Regions:
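Gly/Pro-rich hinge or "lid" segments in bacterial periplasmic/extracellular proteins
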Residues: 86-91, 98-160, 164, 174, ...
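Surface-exposed binding/hinge segments that line
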Residues: 5, 15, 50-114
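Ligand-binding "clamshell"
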Residues: 196-211
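Structural transition elements
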Residues: 257-283
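Ligand-site clamp/hinge motif
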Residues: 152-198, 216
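Short helices/loops that flank or line small-molecule/ion binding pockets
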Residues: 25-27, 32, 173-187, 231-235
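Aromatic- and charge-enriched surface segment that lines or borders ligand/interaction sites
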Residues: 2-50, 78, 84, 178
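Alpha-helical secondary-structure segments
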Residues: 29-36, 82-86, 134-135, 163-164, ...
Length: 283
């Protein structure tokens, strides 16, 4: 997509880039999006995610459409390059983008429409896709050890400069030794679980440059308001936790305390909000 807009925070208009195309040259259209949604939300696919349940026409409890459904009111094609997503309840743009749009995967309709509905996830294409929309294609993988990629030379934004990538699946105890030996070239806390006790040792490696960027993930506490309806109790939990100490001691100062879902690096960050301070007595 090259733009997402909304006027009421329920109807989100997604415009697909005019140049976007699959690796076989077929244009990516709104039909790909709507058809992919139907297939992924099918009860025969039994997708483990429940994110589809927030959209109109999808069961809120299961996240599925009816078996054999040919359309869903919550995801419709406006024109060849425009799709409208309609949610059951209003949500902010950042919630739609980061919690839903980011996890919806569009597939090539002209490929998957030839695969039986209940056989999608076990099909050869699904597990070894040779028609893709991104810069890389999977060439090989071992679920417990690695996944290998080759550049998509027909990528509509231009072929990647790195021809091949091999993503190793490591146990956290292997990260330090793999960096030390040069077995892996790069990693991050978002790619693998780097033990806190290894941070100083990794920073000391002569063959490794540690680069800290802006925070991109967060740790939050989610509370069932039906079980704890008193807002004062929920507020007390925030006052009782020394979040700055967690940043200073656990994250070595590489983080920030925020009252919200997005970091200061996000264009949706509201810098007018002052985070609640640690105050055990008030709690």
């Amino acid at each position: 997509a090259d733009s997402i807009t909304t006027e009421d925070n329920k109807n989100f208009i997604v415009h697909i880039n005019e140049d976007a195309a699959w690796s076989d040259g077929t244009p990516i259209t709104s039909d790909d999006v709507t058809y992919s949604f139907l297939r992924l939300a099918s009860p025969l696919v039994a997708n483990a995610t429940l994110v589809y349940g927030v959209f109109e026409g999808v069961d809120s409890e299961t996240g599925f459409v009816e078996e054999g459904a040919t359309e869903v009111s919550g995801v419709t094609a406006v024109d060849e390059k425009t799709v409208q997503f309609t949610t059951k309840e209003p949500m902010s743009m950042i919630t739609f983008m980061s919690s839903y749009a980011a996890y919806f995967h569009t597939m090539p309709k002209h490929i998957i429409e030839n695969i039986a509905e209940g056989e999608l996830t076990t099909s050869d294409w699904f597990n070894h896709p040779d028609v893709v929309s991104g810069p890389y294609m999977v060439t090989d993988y071992d679920t417990n050890h690695y996944i290998s990629y080759a550049a998509n030379e027909n990528y509509w934004k231009g072929a990647p400069k790195i021809g091949r990538m091999n993503i190793k699946i490591l146990d956290s105890s292997q990260v330090y030794s793999s960096l030390q030996s040069g077995e892996i070239d790069v990693t991050s806390h978002t790619m693998t679980n780097i033990p806190q006790e290894d941070n100083d040792s990794i920073e000391a490696l002569e063959n490794v440059d540690v680069v800290y960027g802006s925070p991109v993930t967060n740790q939050s506490v989610f509370i069932q308001t039906k079980n704890i309806p008193d807002a004062r109790v929920r507020q007390a939990l925030v006052y009782a936790i020394d979040r700055q100490k967690i940043v200073d001691d656990l994250l070595k100062g590489h983080g920030e305390v925020i009252d919200g879902f997005v970091s200061s690096a996000s264009p949706y960050f509201d810098d007018s909000i002052t985070p609640i301070s640690y105050d055990p007595e008030k709690a």
